[in-house]
From Swiss-Prot:
Transmembrane segments: none annotated. Pfam families: Spot_14. This is Thyroid hormone-inducible hepatic protein. It comes from the Eukaryota. Residues 90-104 have a biased composition (Acidic residues). The keyword Disulfide bond does not apply. Keywords: Cytoplasm, Lipid biosynthesis, Lipid metabolism, Nucleus, Phosphoprotein, Transcription, Transcription regulation.
Length: 150
């Protein structure tokens, strides 16, 4: 596993981002054959498998994709929407997105900027921590499958 070279306070967003990037890079180095992760479910709390949960390969590709954005910055909004939608958007979807965006703008004007920042900052911190754990679980599960458990 890669060692963090920068030192920030424990709960600093930069620390969480660095930790996430390091864990995903470690996952990429350990998982030599990603196709082995197809159709393997990540067990939930108590060892139970959730119905409809994504397989480990889906987690692997998602975690790598998010890591690229964490390391290199956001894609332009149009590229991101096209990527998510698979380049298939209809007029109705565009109208719904514009309506949703207008609603978000109205709500955001009502909240003060500091409260918005705190909400998004806490959410980002929580999500990155959760994704870091998922990357560790994918790595551990792959090691178990290939007999690399130490």
């Amino acid at each position: 596993m890669q060692v963090l070279t920068k030192r920030y306070p424990k709960n600093c967003l930069l620390t969480v981002m660095d930790r996430y990037s390091a864990v995903v890079r470690n996952m990429e180095q350990v998982v030599m054959i990603p196709s082995l992760l197809r159709d393997v479910q990540l067990s939930g709390p108590g060892g139970s498998v959730q119905d409809g949960a994504p397989d480990l390969y889906t987690y692997f590709t998602m975690l790598k994709s998010i890591c690229v954005e964490v390391d290199h910055g956001l894609l332009p909004r149009e590229e991101w929407q096209a990527k998510v939608a698979g380049n298939e958007t209809s007029e109705a979807e565009n109208d719904a997105a514009e309506t949703e965006e207008a609603e978000e703008d109205r709500i955001s004007e009502e909240l003060d900027l500091e409260a918005q920042f705190h909400l998004h900052f806490c959410s980002l911190h929580h999500i990155l921590t959760h994704l870091t754990r998922k990357a560790q679980e994918v790595t551990r599960k792959y090691q178990e499958m290939t007999g690399q458990v130490l």
